[in-house]
């Protein structure tokens, strides 16, 4: 791979299906079919990324299965079970202004309007109504917090996201 950025994981190869090398696909994309908008895929085998192309895919009941070029037997498919499916970071679709990929928010420092450093985004939780930042508090948090949950609601709680500085400005009480 030519990129210095870590590939973006979009899913995982599941169990083999049938005798012709098809595999079940677990997709982490918003719509499960969106994983097929990207080509080629990178799969991680024995710690190394390698390129593969999808020859064809289809629904099998509620599951999605795919045939990969060069994988023509059940034994070959079984060797790929549980491999991650990724794409180069630069292949990600551009987002409109004020929309962000979760992976870009992870690790950002969260600071409130009074300049208090609340910690770093550890993960993001999807709740249905809005996403929530799980912020791991700094070791010497002045309010005794170990983590904070801040709704990702722009203009109300999230005032500014500066990816270049890896910083998120929030209107949030550090004691909450």
Swiss-Prot record:
A Gene Ontology MF term for this entry? Answer: ribosome binding
Main location as per UniProt? cytoplasm
Keywords associated with the record: Chaperone, Cytoplasm, Ribosome biogenesis, rRNA processing
Q: Does the keyword Nuclease apply?
A: no
Matching entries from Gene3D superfamilies are given as: PRC-barrel domain (2.30.30.240), RimM (2.40.30.60)
Q: Is Cytoplasm found in the keyword set? A: yes
Cellular location(s): Cytoplasm
| NCBIfam families referenced in this protein's UniProt entry, alphabetically | 16S_RimM
The domain-related comment in the record is: The PRC barrel domain binds ribosomal protein uS19.
Question: Tell me, how does this one assemble?
Answer: Binds ribosomal protein uS19.
As for family, the record states: Belongs to the RimM family.
The record ties this protein, via HAMAP family, to:
Ribosome_mat_RimM
Name-wise, this protein is Ribosome maturation factor RimM
Give the originating organism: Shewanella loihica (strain ATCC BAA-1088 / PV-4)
Give me the gene this protein comes from. rimM
């Amino acid at each position: 791979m030519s990129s210095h950025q870590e590939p973006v994981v979009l899913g995982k190869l599941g169990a083999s299906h049938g005798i012709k090398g098809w595999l079940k696909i677990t997709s982490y994309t918003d719509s499960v079919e969106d994983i097929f908008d990207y080509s080629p895929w990178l799969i991680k085998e024995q710690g190394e990324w390698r390129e593969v192309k999808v020859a064809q895919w289809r629904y099998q009941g509620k599951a999605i299965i795919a045939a990969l070029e060069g994988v023509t037997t059940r034994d070959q498919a079984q060797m790929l079970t549980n491999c991650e499916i990724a794409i180069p970071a630069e292949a990600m679709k551009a987002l409109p202004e004020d929309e962000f990929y979760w992976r870009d928010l992870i690790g950002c420092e969260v600071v409130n309007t009074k300049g208090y450093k609340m910690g770093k985004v550890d993960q993001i939780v999807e709740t249905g109504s809005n996403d929530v930042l799980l912020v791991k508090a700094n070791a010497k948090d002045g309010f005794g917090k170990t983590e904070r949950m801040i709704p990702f609601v722009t203009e109300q709680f999230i005032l500014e996201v500066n990816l270049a500085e890896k910083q998120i400005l929030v209107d949030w009480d550090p004691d909450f």
